[in-house]
Amino acid sequence: MPPSGKIEVAEEGNRRKGEMTPSEMRQCATDIVAWFTQHADLDAKGCDQSVIDELSKKRDVPLALEELWREAATDVWFEGYQLLHPQSIGKMLSDIDAPYVPFARDIDDALLVVGDDAVYEYEMGDGRGDRLSSSIADYLEAYRNKLLEGRFEYMDGDGCVETMASAPSRGK
């Protein structure tokens, strides 16, 4: 019998349907911090809940970000962006347009912010830039997966850089 021309793609693995649950967000934060503990000698110290609550009074803080801060308040890197302590964020909010909450900064003071649950790049003089992810939970999960797949290595003071083995082929 000739093929029908119909192609079916088999999806492997255990894909989640819908948003992350609170326990999945907690596990994601734990996995990210564990990676930095192992690869960057991170001495993880979570943030006191009262500090997170104080920030939450000023801006809407997504649960996925709260879970990360409960595990580690600083020294986690998102490639070249370092996680900001919630206390320092509270002091920055007067310079950042609402509803955005900065959560990481690079060496040039560019920020990663979350607003309306999406993740964006943010420049202090220019405001919101490119959208990086539709939600902070998706952003953290994708980053965690890349860390655990061995696609990044930690470079002291520079953050995480993509490993050569995972870099796209440049051709001949």
Regions found by a protein language model. Give the residues of each.
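A surface-exposed partner-binding patch
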Residues: 2-116, 154-155, 167-172
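Generic structural signal for residues positioned in beta-strands
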Residues: 102, 118-120, 138
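Compact, glycine/acidic-enriched structural inserts
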Residues: 123, 127-154
